[in-house]
Design a protein with these regions (language model features):
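A detector for short, charged/polar N-terminal pre-domain segments
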Residues: 1-10
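Short amphipathic helical patch at the helix-1/turn junction of helix-turn-helix
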Residues: 9, 20-21, 49
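Short basic helix-loop element that most often maps to the first helix and adjoining turn
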Residues: 13-32, 57
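Conserved hydrophobic/aromatic packing and binding residues within compact polymer-binding modules
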Residues: 15, 29-30, 40-43, 69
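Recognition helix of helix-turn-helix/homeodomain-like DNA-binding domains
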Residues: 35-48
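DNA major-groove recognition helix of helix-turn-helix/homeodomain DNA-binding modules
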Residues: 54-68
């Protein structure tokens, strides 16, 4: 883990990378997750401390395990 980034920033960068690999906009991704687009943006910028329920929703939408979200 890089010392100069917070866990939220690392997680957000990982989510953004995986979303872009799917070719999804933030709006499409938010719809797939059942979350709001501005919330997804805040996650990707590392501004939110994401709940376990929302982590699960993100992993499910991306069709990956929760563990894979933390492979940064």
């Amino acid at each position: 883990m890089r010392k100069n980034k917070t866990v939220q920033q690392l997680f957000g960068s990982r989510v953004r990378k995986l979303r872009k690999l799917k070719g999804w906009s933030q709006e499409r991704f938010a719809d797939e997750c059942g979350l709001h687009r501005t919330y997804i943006g805040a996650i990707e910028r590392g501004e939110r401390n994401v709940s376990l329920n929302n982590i699960h929703a993100i992993a499910k939408a991306l069709d990956i395990s929760v563990k894979e979200l933390f492979d940064y």
